A protein has these predicted regions:
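C-terminal motif of bacterial Sec signal peptides marking the signal peptidase cleavage site
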Residues: 5-8
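Bacterial signal peptide processing site
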Residues: 10-12
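N-terminal helix-rich structural modules
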Residues: 19-218, 222-236, 240-260
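Active-site scaffold of zinc-dependent metalloenzymes
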Residues: 29, 36, 385-409
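Segments forming glycine/polar-rich beta-alpha architectures that bind adenosine-containing cofactors
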Residues: 251-255, 267-275
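Active-site-proximal, well-structured secondary-structure segments within enzyme catalytic domains
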Residues: 287-330, 334
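Conserved small/polar residues in nucleotide/adenosyl-binding loops
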Residues: 360-367
Length: 409
C-alpha cells in the first residue's frame, strides 16, 4: 500500500517523497519478546499487471494453508486459538484489565508462533492470566462461537484445554530432539497419532525403505501423519481427498488461477506439477516438481508452497507446511551483482587468515549460484534438503573443490 502511494506521488517534489519515506513507520506492534515490522516492497509498481495477478493468487494460496501449520505444531493449537479469538472479539469487560491485557498478549504470541509454543525455543508459553479468568471469559462466550466437538459441552471443552494452557508439564516442548526419552511421545507436535512410539515409527519406515531405490529415493513419510488404526500403523497423506483436504483444495484452486498468469511455460509447468502433487500425494511427483522449480532461473516471480522443512519432526521425516512468495528486485540485484563480482577483492582485504582463503577455487565465478542467492535466499536451502540425489551431487562437488584446493596447497 505504501509503495503504491509513493508511486502515485512521483509528480510531486522530491523532498515531499523523501519526507514520506522518512515518516514511514516500520513498527506495527511490540509485545513479549517480539517486535512486528512491516516493510516497503520496492519494485512492485514496476511489475506488469499479469505479474501482479500471479503474485496475488500465489499469495492467496499461501494464506489458505495457515491452519495446516497450526495443526501440525500441536493438535490443540487450533481449538485454543479459536477459543481465544472468540474471547478477544466478544469480551464485554474492561479491556485495560491486566488479566485481559495478558490474554491479548498470549493470543498475539499464538498468532505469531503458529501455536502455543515459542517459534524458536519451542517451549510452551506461560500465560499471564489465571485459569479462573479464562474460565469466566469462556463462560461469557456463546457455545456456537467455540470449536466444540460434536456432543461436547463448554465445561468439557474448558476442562480439556485448560491443562494444555496452564500446566507447564503438559505438552511442555513442541519438538524434543535429545535426552533419554521417546522423542515422539515427549514432543507436543502433531505429526504422529496418539500412542505411536519412536521405535514403532523407526521400524515402520525401515521396512518401507527396505529393498527400495537407494540412489534416488523419495522422501519417505514427508507428507503424511502416521497414526494407529485398530492397532495398526497407517499413513494419513496430506493431499486432496486426504488429511487437510479442505485447506489443500483451496490452495489448489488458487494455484489453478495462478497458472493463467504464469510468466513462461516453465513456470506454468512448475505450478501444474505442484497441483498434480497436491492432488495425488505422490512423492515421486514432488521430486519432479522440485527439480522443475530448481531449474527455473528465468522467472521474475518465485514461490514456495508445500510440505518442505522437517525441523519440526524430532525424527526429521515429516515436513511442516509453508509458503513464501517473492519477486526479483532488479535494482537490488544489480547492486548485489557488483558485490558478487568483486567478492575476491573483499576476501583479499579481509582480516581472515589466508589458510581459509578460497582464492584457489572458482567459487566466485559461479554466477548461477550468485543468481540463485539474489533471487531468493531460501531457494538453496529449501527443497534440496529432501532430494537425496541432488544433495549427494552437491556434496560431491564440494568435496572435489576441497580436494583441488588441498592439492594446490
Amino acid at each position: 500500500m505504501t509503495a503504491m502511494v509513493m508511486t502515485a506521488c512521483t509528480g510531486q517534489k522530491a523532498e515531499k517523497v523523501e519526507a514520506t519515506q522518512d515518516n514511514f513507520n516500520y513498527v506495527v506492534d511490540q509485545f513479549a519478546d517480539l517486535q512486528i515490522l512491516r516493510y516497503r516492497v520496492p519494485g512492485f509498481e514496476s511489475l506488469s499487471l499479469k505479474q501482479k495477478q500471479l503474485l496475488y493468487h500465489l499469495s492467496e494460496a499461501a494464506l489458505m494453508g495457515r491452519d495446516i501449520l497450526f495443526d501440525q505444531n500441536c493438535r490443540y493449537n487450533l481449538p485454543i486459538r479459536r477459543a481465544l479469538e472468540a474471547v478477544y472479539t466478544g469480551y464485554k469487560g474492561d479491556r485495560t484489565d491486566p488479566q485481559f491485557v495478558a490474554l491479548e498478549t498470549y493470543l498475539k504470541r499464538v498468532w505469531f508462533a503458529n501455536g502455543i509454543h515459542h517459534h524458536y525455543a519451542e517451549d510452551k508459553f506461560v500465560p499471564g492470566f489465571t485459569p479462573e479468568f479464562f474460565q469466566t471469559c469462556i463462560s461469557q462466550v456463546g457455545a456456537s462461537a467455540l470449536p466444540l466437538r460434536e456432543g461436547q459441552t463448554v465445561e468439557q471443552f474448558v476442562a480439556e484445554i485448560s491443562p494444555v494452557i496452564f500446566d507447564p508439564a503438559v505438552m511442555a516442548k513442541r519438538t524434543v530432539q535429545s535426552g533419554d526419552v521417546d522423542l515422539i511421545r515427549a514432543s507436543a507436535n502433531n505429526y504422529y497419532g496418539e500412542g505411536v512410539t519412536q521405535v514403532e515409527v523407526e521400524d515402520f519406515y525401515a521396512r518401507m525403505k527396505a529393498g527400495k531405490d537407494t540412489i534416488s529415493p523419495i522422501s519417505y513419510g514427508l507428507n503424511s501423519r502416521l497414526v494407529k488404526e485398530n492397532g495398526k500403523l497407517v499413513e494419513k497423506v496430506w493431499k486432496v481427498g486426504g488429511l487437510y483436504s479442505s485447506a489443500i483444495e483451496k490452495i489448489v484452486s488458487e494455484l489453478q488461477k495462478a497458472t493463467a498468469f504464469a510468466e513462461n511455460d516453465a513456470q506454468k509447468s512448475i505450478i501444474g506439477k505442484l497441483i498434480e502433487y497436491y492432488q495425488s500425494g505422490d512423492l515421486k511427483i514432488f521430486d519432479a516438481y522440485s527439480i522443475l522449480w530448481v531449474e527455473d532461473t528465468a522467472s521474475d516471480v518465485d514461490f514456495v508452497n508445500g510440505f518442505i522443512e522437517t525441523y519440526g519432526d524430532p525424527l526429521g521425516m515429516k515436513a511442516s507446511w509453508e509458503s513464501t512468495v517473492n519477486f526479483i528486485n532488479k535494482e537490488a540485484t544489480k547492486r548485489t551483482k557488483v558485490i558478487s563480482d568483486n567478492a575476491q577483492w573483499f576476501e583479499d582485504h579481509s582480516p581472515v587468515d589466508k589458510l581459509y582463503s578460497s582464492a584457489a577455487s572458482d567459487v566466485y565465478k559461479r554466477q548461477g549460484f550468485a543468481a540463485i542467492m539474489v533471487r531468493n535466499p531460501l531457494r538453496s536451502r529449501i527443497s534440496l534438503r529432501h532430494m537425496t540425489k541432488l544433495l549427494r551431487e552437491m556434496v560431491l562437488m564440494m568435496n572435489l573443490s576441497g580436494a583441488i584446493r588441498s592439492a594446490k596447497d
